[in-house]
């Protein structure tokens, strides 16, 4: 029951936050709402073409905060944090993978594919249902629904 209530709250929060992000040309990448040692935290991860600055985070935080104060979906005090997803950001949706074609990624699978549960390679192609990775000298097709976790590999 608690999971259902949590998921409903996340959906409400997304329904409030996402239109604000879109209005100001940001993409809502992810939302987290969790209890931490210092209290409840609502984390909003945003992105935009060219990357996100500290000023962007402050600007959109103010807009989101005003709307959350009006709609008041959270019944107790919390801290709002707005940030970019970082260099080693998780990839979750088709568009996340599309944005990073040609970049290295580390993927953990829900079940083995071709005898592997973890795969590292470059994103070669993305379609509606699959991500194709170039692993060494061969291509590996991975259904997006079979991906447990995907992280960009930062190369310097």
From Swiss-Prot:
It comes from the Bacteria. Coiled coil: none annotated. CDD domains: YlxS_C. GO terms for biological process: ribosomal small subunit assembly; translation. SUPFAM superfamilies: YhbC-like, C-terminal domain, YhbC-like, N-terminal domain. It holds the Pfam family DUF150_C. Keywords: Cytoplasm, Ribosome biogenesis. Its main location: cytoplasm. One of its GO terms (cellular component) is cytosol. It is found in: Cytoplasm. InterPro entries: Ribosome_maturation_RimP, RimP_C, RimP_C_sf, RimP_N, RimP_N_sf. Belongs to the RimP family. PANTHER family: RIBOSOME MATURATION FACTOR RIMP. Required for maturation of 30S ribosomal subunits. This is Ribosome maturation factor RimP. It comes from Dictyoglomus turgidum (strain DSM 6724 / Z-1310).
């Amino acid at each position: 029951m608690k999971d259902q209530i949590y998921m409903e709250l996340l959906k409400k929060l997304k329904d409030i936050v996402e239109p604000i992000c879109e209005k100001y040309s940001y993409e809502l990448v992810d939302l987290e709402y969790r209890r931490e040692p210092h209290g409840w935290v609502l984390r909003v991860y945003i992105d935009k073409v060219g990357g996100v600055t500290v000023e962007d985070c402050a600007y959109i935080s103010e807009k989101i905060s005003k709307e959350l104060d009006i709609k008041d979906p959270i019944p107790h005090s919390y801290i709002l944090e707005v940030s970019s997803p970082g260099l080693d950001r998780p990839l979750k949706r088709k568009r996340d993978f599309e944005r990073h074609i040609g970049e290295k990624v580390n993927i953990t699978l829900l079940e083995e594919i071709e005898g592997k549960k973890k795969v590292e390679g470059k994103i070669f192609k993305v379609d509606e249902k699959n991500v194709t990775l170039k692993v060494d000298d061969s291509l590996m097709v991975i259904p997006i629904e079979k991906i447990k976790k995907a992280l960009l590999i930062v190369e310097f």
